Amino acid sequence: MPKYLIEREIPGAGNLSAAELQAISQKSSQILTAMGPQIQWVNSYVTDDKVYCIYIAPNADAVREHARQGGFPANRISQIKTMIDPSTAE
């Protein structure tokens, strides 16, 4: 199943408290459970003003629907084509 990188513009994201991040995570997880196993949240990276999320989903529309239901921004959704790391250089 394809993986997607979602860029979410959230001003002040890096200053969200642990409790706020927990609440956002709980809401996201509840929606994912309701949507079924075809869409999965892998992880997220929080920066100053953006959150970058990795999802496994059948298509970008499923990612958009998750964002719509949660009221989360999804400013850019890109399908991940491949992953490289330092071992790729060997």
Model-derived features: positions:
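An amphipathic, aromatic/His-enriched active-site/gating alpha helix that lines ligand/cofactor pockets
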Residues: 56-83
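A short linear hydrophobic-aromatic micro-motif
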Residues: 37-43, 76
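Amphipathic, hydrophobic secondary-structure cores in small proteins
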Residues: 41-52, 63
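Short S/T/G/P-rich N-terminal loop/turn motif that feeds into the first structured element of a domain
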Residues: 1-33, 40, 50, 85-90
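Generic, well-ordered alpha-helical segments
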Residues: 20, 47, 55-58
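Short, flexible active-site loop motifs that bind/organize anionic cofactors or intermediates
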Residues: 11, 53, 67
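Acidic/polar N-terminal loop/beta-strand segments that form early-domain functional surfaces
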Residues: 9, 44, 56
